[in-house]
Amino acid sequence: MNKKLNDVLLKLDQDLIKYVKGSLDLEISGVTYSSKLVLPGFVFFALPGIRFDGHDFIEMAIQNGSNVIVHSRDMDFYSPNVTYIKVDDFSIRKFMSNFSNVFYDEPSKKLKVIGVTGTDGKSSVCYYIYLLLKKKGVKVGFISTVFFDDGSGSLIKNPYRQSTPESTEIHAFLSNMVKNGVQYAILESTSHGLDLKTARLIDVNYFAAVFTNIGHEHLEFHGTIQNYLNVKLGLFRSVSDDAGFGVINLDDFYSSEFKNAVKKSFTYSLKSSQADFFVSFIDEKIDSTRFEFYYKGVKYFANVNLLGSFNVENVMAALILVSQILNSDIQDIVDKLVCIKSLDGRMDSINLGQNFSVIIDYAHTPGAFSKLFPIFKRFATNRLISVFGSAGERDVAKRFLQGQISDIYSDLILLCDEDPRGENSMCIIKDIAKGIVNKVVNQDLFFIPDRKQAIEKAISLARAGDLVVVLGKGHESSIIYKNREVFWNEQEVVKNAILSLEKEK
């Protein structure tokens, strides 16, 4: 896809541009913020960052073939045959999003984009919507923390460390969906992605939105819970007024604000019969859940191969969304719930014939802990052993809450690394331990920063009937330290620990 630079610039907000130095009569072939990804004819956006400054990589970008540099700081030297566009520091990400959107011919306007937001459950809801739409024969694509599908029909693992990619990648991916004939695009819309500070999603046109819940998360980025809430409300406010709608969890404290943010909405609840869709009964088993719900006075009976009432919430959100966008009979969607399966790293049960149970889950917020731990305790026929940590350089206040919740339900707790980043591992662990008051260190509470060693210790302590839960990483393929990332595969580490234990017997 090639464009004339001037043709793109003419469609952008000229107030964002401080000056242009060089020719506008250039052909551009791509957009990126990574000098490593630059190809001949690419526009390079020199983004300022926390650890790295894109301005330090301008020379490399030019060497790799970039002919247009978008920057926000004064240059000491201007290379000939390269065009420089200067914008303000605070608007460079907005400009990058605007530019990418226009370069790729505003792809979201050619799709019906469904945004899913909330603290917990986003990835699962996206995946369930995706599976149900595919089962209905609809051409669908999606972008989530775990998987991508550009409409080619094959799932690929999210290659980026953040849940929501940068705007250059978002619009490129949406453009591929258009080329592949996608009708509906499901987009996991995180608070980071929705925030104007990152501007990753500001040029996406949303047809419908789903709200799962609000909990204690990302306050290190947003500052206050109100800021965090407002960012998510922005998604609902942006939904198309004509045919668009929202799907809202009525059980959440902030549900009324989301209802007020969108013209048309459908609510679901596990507690209130005032919801449009009311779940009146849930019967949980270790590998499946049966539930009943009402809609417009009609009672429906449903069964899913998933564990937990939280998954009933996620399934209801997906069911409502799909039934409404396709104007389908509710029973028809209920019948297709058997196609739903869990995501990688979500309630993964590891069974290699051992006499105890092991579950891996991505849960890493107090909200997720409060939903999962009662379920874990209920299904542990003997002791509950918990292995988890908390992210470094992220919301510090949640650490105490994670410790407090785990303390109530767990018999043994092993604290370890999640992603310490630039923080000291033991400091993070001790922050979590402040919430743990009913355990004794080195008796039923262990501080083991090395996650592999912590998992191996937990497996070695497990007895017949115990349930070991390993939380916080799930599908993630690395552990982030200050100056390095270490490859990680939670499932393999757990399996190897179990196999090693069996060999010792």
Swiss-Prot record:
Modification N6-carboxylysine occurs at: 232
Membrane-spanning ranges: none
Annotated residues for binding of ATP: 118-124
Superkingdom of source: Bacteria
GO biological process, one term: peptidoglycan biosynthetic process
Keywords: ATP-binding, Cell cycle, Cell division, Cell shape, Cell wall biogenesis/degradation, Cytoplasm, Ligase, Nucleotide-binding, Peptidoglycan synthesis
Molecular function GO terms recorded: acid-amino acid ligase activity; ATP binding; magnesium ion binding
Residues involved in UDP-N-acetyl-alpha-D-muramoyl-L-alanyl-D-glutamate binding: 35, 163-164, 190, 200
InterPro entries on file: Mur-like_cat_sf, Mur_ligase_C, Mur_ligase_C_dom_sf, Mur_ligase_cen, Mur_ligase_N, MurE/MurF_N, UDP-N-AcMur-Glu-dNH2Pim_ligase
GO cellular component terms given for this protein: cytoplasm
Record pathway: Cell wall biogenesis; peptidoglycan biosynthesis
PTM per Swiss-Prot/TrEMBL: Carboxylation is probably crucial for Mg(2+) binding and, consequently, for the gamma-phosphate positioning of ATP.
Subcellular location field: Cytoplasm
EC number: 6.3.2.-
Known role: Catalyzes the addition of an amino acid to the nucleotide precursor UDP-N-acetylmuramoyl-L-alanyl-D-glutamate (UMAG) in the biosynthesis of bacterial cell-wall peptidoglycan.
Family statement: Belongs to the MurCDEF family. MurE subfamily.
Name of this protein: UDP-N-acetylmuramyl-tripeptide synthetase
Biological source species: Borreliella afzelii (strain PKo)
